[in-house]
Amino acid sequence: MEISWGRAMWRNFLGQSPDWYKLALLVFLIINPFIFLANPFIAGWLLVAEFIFTLAMALKCYPLLPGGLLAIEAVIIGMTSAAHVREEVAANLEVLLLLMFMVAGIYFMKQLLLFIFTRLLLSIRSKMVLSLAFCVAAAFLSAFLDALTVVAVVISVAVGFYGIYHRVASSRGEENDMLDDSHIDPHYKTVLEQFRGFLRSLMMHAGVGTALGGVMTMVGEPQNLIIAKAAGWHFGDFFLRMSPVTVPVLVCGLLTCMLVEKMRWFGYGETLPEKVRDVLQQFDDQSRKKRTRQDKIKLIVQAIIGVWLVTALALHLAEVGLIGLSVIILATALTGVTDEHAIGKAFTESLPFTALLTVFFSIVAVIIDQHLFAPIIQFVLQASEHAQLTLFYLFNGLLSSISDNVFVGTIYINEAKAAMENGAISLKQFELLAVAINTGTNLPSVATPNGQAAFLFLLTSALAPLIRLSYGRMVWMALPYTIVLTLIGLLCVEFTLAPATEWMTQAGWLATLS
């Protein structure tokens, strides 16, 4: 019997999302206009809370859909205007270009990145050294590339290796289903569980590595570019200004990586079983024999393009997104990718998040029009200049760990810049606050998958169910990093940021906003 029209419409609304989630969103959409008529300020804060809720529930439904519905309603009922949304999007065009073109550009360098991580995995036998190598490699790559893409590459390596061993363990060849363990011998199952633990720890080290490297440069995370633009900093300025906080945090983060592996705390310390290593090594040897001269040329070309990418970013030869576009053109032209559909695949990872970021800017427009953050900013600005840095760092860290750090960073840097333009704080203080905001959004946000887009990408990937990586397990494994990164970042903001910045300014290393 066919279902009713109403039931069909209910099933279509937000698709596979739970009924309680659909009902919650409908309640939000119904009550918002009435609350806005009664009290616009409360309605604005309610909208922000609802939007954060959609981010926190990202595993139930991709936030673009519910967040987009809330944003459309906000424009319709007058919480902001379409013109203001357009202004916010135009002001952040560089960030949208970064997400569209840089992520797509790195897609065409995946072969090189896969080659690098495969070599690391098979050539280093010590688990502690291997974990450190993955963390450092992810940090370095994320400082110049997009963290999401770096994690995507590591996921590709892990899924590939897991599939190779799973096929051998199940003896089912190409027809093997990686989610089905029913055909695996009990002995192989024990080895497989150990292999899963090994991959889980490597993925978490790599994920945290993207946060350690991503906070250091203006292209490491989308919000970094927003903050750099607001402060008028280029690549070198941004790196130097962040370094009093980010360099000590990087060192302590790497020490944490070694400690948890050595002590086998928080689910770390599992080694690669020898039986698995033998299978993977055999497969890699076969792959290397099959590699043609044309394949080798592709790797060399991608490495040269990587040098161009780093050089262009460091010397600020063009806007970041345009450098990404140049990578797409060079990588496709010189490696023989000419089919439109093959090129189109490169954009599938970035465009949903680009659309979500545009919705962020709609919510930011509401926050500005309704003056939602004015009381918080006034409270922070009433404190001493030294205390302001700590408060901005803590407020950003708390919100970023439950919400999305791009959203939080955008709001706070806009408010800090407005305070400077109104004469509430000096230029020097604004530049220090920009560092506190950037580090506050990037470091504590490793606490949950909600805060870091790369973590959320890992949690929702095809790899997570294979290696039994759940939301709770991710939070638990991230806990030592969360504690160390947050506390060291706070201490550096408190004690080293101002004196180190003053020293670099006097030495003539730093440019200031004019």
Swiss-Prot record:
Recorded catalytic activity of this chain's protein? 2 Na(+)(in) + 3 H(+)(out) = 2 Na(+)(out) + 3 H(+)(in)
- State the compartments where it is located: Cell inner membrane
Please give the Gene Ontology molecular function terms for this protein. Answer: sodium:proton antiporter activity
Membrane-crossing segments per the record:
23-43, 63-83, 97-117, 120-140, 144-164, 202-222, 238-258, 303-323, 357-377, 391-411, 447-467, 475-495
UniProt entry keywords in alphabetical sequence: Antiport, Cell inner membrane, Cell membrane, Ion transport, Membrane, Sodium, Sodium transport, Transmembrane, Transmembrane helix, Transport
Q: Does the keyword Transport apply?
A: yes
List, alphabetically, the Pfam families matched: NhaB (PF06450)
Query: GO CC annotations?
Result: plasma membrane
Protein topology in the membrane? Multi-pass membrane protein
**Entries under InterPro entries matching the protein:** Na+/H+_antiporter_NhaB
Main subcellular localisation? membrane
Name the NCBIfam families on file.
NhaB, PRK09547.1
Q: What is the documented function of this protein?
A: Na(+)/H(+) antiporter that extrudes sodium in exchange for external protons.
Question: Record's family?
Answer: Belongs to the NhaB Na(+)/H(+) (TC 2.A.34) antiporter family.
Query: What is the protein name stated in its UniProt record?
Result: Na(+)/H(+) antiporter NhaB
Task: Give the organism, scientific name.
Answer: Salmonella paratyphi B (strain ATCC BAA-1250 / SPB7)
For this protein's source organism, the top of the classification is: Bacteria, Pseudomonadati, Pseudomonadota, Gammaproteobacteria, Enterobacterales
Q: Which gene encodes it?
A: nhaB
